[in-house]
A protein has these predicted regions:
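Ribokinase/PfkB-type carbohydrate-kinase core domain
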Residues: 1-42, 57-60, 64, 78-80, ...
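Membrane-targeting and insertion segments and their boundary/processing signals
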Residues: 38-46, 292, 296
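Glycine/charged-rich beta-loop-alpha catalytic/anionic-binding loops adjacent to active sites
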Residues: 45-56, 92-93, 278-290
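A structural signal for well-ordered alpha-helical segments within the folded catalytic domains
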Residues: 63-66, 70, 303, 324
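Alpha-helix C-terminal capping segments
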Residues: 66-78, 307-311
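Alpha-helical scaffold segments in soluble metabolic enzymes
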Residues: 71-74, 230, 253, 304
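Short, conserved phosphate/pyrophosphate- and ester-handling motifs at nucleotide-, phospho-/glycolipid
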Residues: 72, 224, 298
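Conserved post-catalytic alpha-helical subdomain immediately downstream of the catalytic base
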Residues: 262, 285-342
Length: 342
């Protein structure tokens, strides 16, 4: 393919658990399979305490850079990651990532405890390791000349997650200032994650900075259905996953409001995207009732979307490839290769 991406700046170890609802013996127990069941258990406890037993499911790498970068790399994209993967050497959980991607590590990773259900997941993150990442730290780790070369070579630059990065704006502005004006189109890719964690004023400031730079560096913002609903509401629109309610037109309306080149929404049932260069597109996905793995699903969609874009595919094709990537991932708990998607 020959196209290159650089992803920065986070790094998580995901400790993934299931929650036991009842146990009759050592080997016989039932799990909470629906988030509503677990919520009911918590709510029914009232003002008292609640004791729960958790069952380890896996320990895995996580975060914007590792998940999206590795997903894209598995699909043939030349990928560089800058984040926190281990102080002296990558944590063993990132071994397969470092074998496929070029990795620069700023320190030890953050930790997320993930509680998986059939219909979703709860993520609880300890953020200390990623909250102090800043531009100077990145340049000091990579080296100024090497960092400038990385940016020059990149076709897509991803920064995330916005909601977990106090220095997002500073890093973004420094990257923009460092990019050469050589006629090559370089695209930014963002996944803000759950931006309800930060106030609306912070969101407005960051979006305004992205909008101001969009004419020089086209931007793609990807959100899930819950993030889309919050973003739509902030512009007085009701988000609906019913294709009969002109979801494509609504996506285009929001894209114009935020002033970015491309706006993508992904959900378990469909994906939709609006672009300044193409007509809005919609792609249904095959719903998976009992996914094997959900943590990292949205990132796998994004990795598939990035790979499809770098292959020169049209907007609808990009959505279909991204849907195929995440569909394979949640059913097999494996990031797909191109061969898996054929």
């Amino acid at each position: 393919m020959g196209k290159k991406i650089t992803m920065l700046a986070d790094g998580f170890v995901d400790e993934v658990w299931e929650i036991i609802s009842t146990r009759s013996s050592r080997d016989n127990f039932a799990l909470y399979t629906q988030m509503s069941q677990f919520a009911g258990r918590i709510a029914s406890s009232g003002t008292g305490g609640v004791g729960l037993e958790i069952l380890r499911k896996r320990r895995a790498f996580g975060g914007f850079t590792a998940n999206i970068g590795y997903a894209a790399a598995r699909l043939g994209v030349d990928t560089t990651l800058i984040g926190v993967y281990g102080k002296n050497k990558p944590d063993p959980v990132f071994e397969e990532v470092s074998e496929l991607c070029r990795v620069f590590s700023l320190g030890d990773p953050a930790t997320t405890h993930v509680f998986e259900f059939d219909d979703g997941k709860i993520l609880m993150s300890h953020m200390e390791a990623v909250q102090d990442i800043n531009w100077k730290q990145i340049v000091d780790c990579v080296g100024h000349s090497a960092m400038m070369a990385l940016l020059e070579e990149s076709d897509i630059i991803g920064i995330g997650y916005w909601s977990l990065m106090p220095s997002f704006d500073e890093i973004f502005e420094n990257i923009c200032a460092s990019l050469p004006q050589d006629g090559k189109e370089r695209r930014f890719f963002f996944d803000f994650a759950d931006f309800r964690k930060k106030d609306e004023a912070s969101l407005a400031i960051s979006l305004e900075k992205l909008k101001a730079a969009n004419s020089a560096f086209p931007m793609t913002l990807s959100v899930n259905e819950h993030e889309a609903a919050a973003l739509f509401a902030s512009y007085g629109e009701a988000f609906s996953d019913d294709p009969g309610r002109s979801i494509k037109e609504k996506a285009e309306y929001i894209r114009q409001k935020i002033g970015l080149d491309e706006f993508v929404i992904h959900s378990p049932e469909f994906a939709v995207a609006a672009s300044s260069r193409e007509r809005p597109a919609f792609a249904a996905s095959v719903f998976c009732e009992k996914p094997v793995r959900t943590a990292g699903a949205g990132d796998t969609f994004n990795g598939g979307y990035i790979a499809a874009r770098l292959e020169g595919k049209g907007l609808e094709e990009r959505l279909h490839m991204a849907n195929a990537a995440v569909g394979y991932f949640i059913r097999n708990a494996i990031f797909p290769t191109t061969g898996n998607l054929l």
